[in-house]
Amino acid sequence: MVKELSAFGGFGDSIVRGLRQPEYVHVLLNPLPVYGLLIAWIGLLIAFFSKSRRAQIATLVLVLISSLSAWPAYEFGQQGYDRVLSMTDEDGERWLDEHRDRAEDLIWIFYALAVLSAIAIAAPIKWPKSSAPLVIAVISLTAVTLGTGGYIAYAGGKIRHREFRNEPAPPKKTHEDEH
């Protein structure tokens, strides 16, 4: 694949270099847990009200994939923390710490949604009457997870984008504040 990308000249080399930087991969992946979930949530609402089990399964799979995409976004964010820290100003550093803290504290909700959506796909095979309550539960938890993703992303957007900093940075954390 590297040889194929090199055929594009500097552009291909640039892509390969970027994919070796965890902070770059984080920026590529981090929209998936939010935008992917939003699209899947809208589709699941439509599938639920149209009472199409096939459409529900398809959109539940999208919820599952989108919620699971939070894991690599989180991991690459953790790996890229030090490099981004070295590029930020003092306010950006505080927003970076806030972004990391929010992600560390709340990543579990994405995993819970992935598990619930997998159950909502599989359980109705054996218990067909469980389908509607499980889809409603997934719709509800997806809405909460979308809010959570927005909350995490809000701090992340302020790290390197001064133009988005329309409020003071969070207070600097001491070692006592951590954990």
What are these model-derived regions, one by one?
Residues 2-179:
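Polytopic transmembrane helical bundles with strong interfacial aromatic enrichment
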